[in-house]
C-alpha cells in the first residue's frame, strides 16, 4: 500500500521568516530607522492587485512602511522613468518593487537600467540578475525563486548533490531558481518546451520544480517515487479554480512532498520581499 505524499504549505516558512524580521525591524526602529517599500504599479491588473494586497499586509505586520504609486495605463516611457528616478532619489525609500510585465508601450529593456540596484528588491536591474548568475549573495535575487529555495531548506530537503530538474527557463523563475540551486550544490537540469522526452527527463529528478505556466501539465509520468515537487505555477483550470502546473491528485501517491497551489510558494514570496526590504535598509544604513 502506497503512502500519500506530504503536502508542504508555505505558511510555516513565511511565519518563521516574518518572526525574525519583526525582531530586526524593531531594532532598526529603536535607532530611528524605518524600513520602507514603494510599489510602482501601472494600471490595475487583478494579479498585481492580489499580490500587492498580500505584500502590503505582510510588510505592515512586520513593521515595514509601505507606499503604492498607481500610475495611469497610458503613462509615457519618460513619465515612468521620471517616477522611478524620483523614488530612486528618495532617501526614505529602501526598496522598490516595479510590477511587471509593463504595458507593451513601455520598454522594460530600457527601464530596467533605471532602477537603483541597491533598492531593487525583486531583481529587475541587470546588476542584480548578474549577481544571481555569479552566485554573489550581496544582491537581490527574484523573490519567487528565493521562496522556492527557502521552502526546500525549511523542510530539510538535502540539495547537495541532488538531481534537481527545473521545468521552465524564464528569467522570472526558471533561470534564476536554477542558479540559486546551483549555489546550494544541486545538480541542475533545465527543461523547456523543446526538451525531448520531457516527462522522462523530469522523472529522473530527486526534486522537481514546475514553473511552466500550464495548468496541471505535470502528471504522474513526470515524477519518480519519493520525489519532492515544488509547484510554482499559478493557473486557472477548466472549472475556473486556481491550480498549479502539477496535477496534485495524480502525483500525490508517488511524491514524498509537494507544495499546494494556492498556499504554497506564493505565500512565502511576500516574506522574501519583506526580507529584501530589510536587507536593503540595513545596507543603506551601514548596519
Swiss-Prot record:
One of its GO terms (molecular function) is methylenetetrahydrofolate dehydrogenase (NADP+) activity. GO terms for cellular component: cytosol. The keyword GTP-binding does not apply. Keywords: Amino-acid biosynthesis, Histidine biosynthesis, Hydrolase, Methionine biosynthesis, Multifunctional enzyme, NADP, One-carbon metabolism, Oxidoreductase, Purine biosynthesis. GO terms for biological process: L-histidine biosynthetic process; methionine biosynthetic process; purine nucleotide biosynthetic process; tetrahydrofolate interconversion. NADP(+) binds at residues 168-170, 193, 234. Its EC number is 1.5.1.5, 3.5.4.9. Gene3D superfamilies: Leucine Dehydrogenase, chain A, domain 1, NAD(P)-binding Rossmann-like Domain. Belongs to the tetrahydrofolate dehydrogenase/cyclohydrolase family. Catalyzes the oxidation of 5,10-methylenetetrahydrofolate to 5,10-methenyltetrahydrofolate and then the hydrolysis of 5,10-methenyltetrahydrofolate to 10-formyltetrahydrofolate. HAMAP family: THF_DHG_CYH (MF_01576). Homodimer. This is Bifunctional protein FolD. It comes from Clostridioides difficile (strain 630).
